Amino acid sequence: MIVSGVDIVIQKSERKTVSIFIERDGSVSARVPEKLKDEEIRDILKAKEYQIFKNLAEWTQLNENAVEREYVNGQSFLYLGRNYRLKLVEEKLEGVHFNRNTFFLSKTDKHKAKELFVKFYKDKLNSKIHPIIERYKNQLGVEPKQIKVMELQNRWASCMPNGNVNFHWKCAMAPIDVLHYIIVHELAHLIHNNHTQAFWNEVDKILPNYDEQVNWLKINGVGMDL
């Protein structure tokens, strides 16, 4: 749906309010109640025109600092919130190695460096999230059915209606406290599948300072990429 010249992806669900999101790629999404007709949706979005343009302007400003990484000696890559440099080596390694605060990659594997970095992040995230999930699921009284690390396009994580919880492999780039927030956020969706005040109250019970992590993602999320 195009409103005021902006192409907005409409997502209908069993919710009571209309929420607007600027996705990580700059596209605009609106999550709306299923019962609303198209004209009603258009009127609501038109009334939120200022908010939409304000959020788009903020996204543009934040993304001016986006980094395009090359797989060369000295290039930095994020891991758990810190940047570490890459060193290409002559010896044959199995994938990406991380040792002594340095990434190592065989020169012969440079042509598939992105693929190998993705595997590195997936493996590391898998090893990190399960103990954290175990801790917080008990505090929240929830039980996710299945945990997956995968490509999620414009989301850091997702909680499915069937109880599965998915995490983007890029979450391995975030600081550990931000990773804790992302996990708590998704587990709280097993209680409230929305972003009502009741949902945020659940998050706040576990992480009273979660606003700090939300702000970190807003400012630095653009750099969590390859």
List each model region and its residues.
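Active-site-proximal or metal-binding-adjacent scaffold patches in catalytic folds
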Residues: 1-180, 190-226
